[in-house]
Design a protein with these regions (language model features):
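Extended low-polarity, hydrophobic cluster-rich segments
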Residues: 11-12, 41, 68
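Short, cationic-aromatic polyanion-contact patches
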Residues: 2-8, 56-72
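Proline- and acidic/polar-enriched loop/turn elements at helix boundaries
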Residues: 29, 40, 57-58
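Short amphipathic alpha-helical interface segments
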Residues: 3-29
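Hydrophobic beta-strand residues in large extracellular and virion-surface proteins
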Residues: 14, 27, 51, 59-61
C-alpha cells in the first residue's frame, strides 16, 4: 500500500524529482500513481507558477515569489 501523502506533498515530490532529472516512469512507480494524476500534478504546478525546493526534509513551496506552503 502506498504511503499517504497530501496533494501538495505529491506535487512537491514530483517536481523536485523531475528537477533532479529522475525519469517520469520511476517517479510514477515510486509514488504509485496513474499517468493522469502525474500529468495533473505537473500541470497544476506549472499553471500556478509553483517553485518547490527541498530543504531539511521539507518542501518549501512559493507561488509568484511569495510563500505558499511548507510540507514534509
Amino acid at each position: 500500500m502506498p504511503e499517504e501523502r497530501s496533494p501538495l506533498q505529491t506535487i512537491a515530490v514530483i517536481c523536485v524529482k523531475l528537477d533532479q532529472g529522475e525519469p517520469e516512469e520511476k517517479i510514477r512507480e515510486y509514488l504509485d500513481i496513474e499517468d493522469e494524476l502525474f500529468a495533473f500534478c505537473v500541470e497544476f504546478a506549472l499553471e500556478n507558477n509553483l517553485i518547490i525546493k527541498q530543504e531539511s526534509g521539507r518542501y518549501e513551496i512559493t507561488r509568484y515569489g511569495k510563500e505558499f506552503a511548507s510540507v514534509f
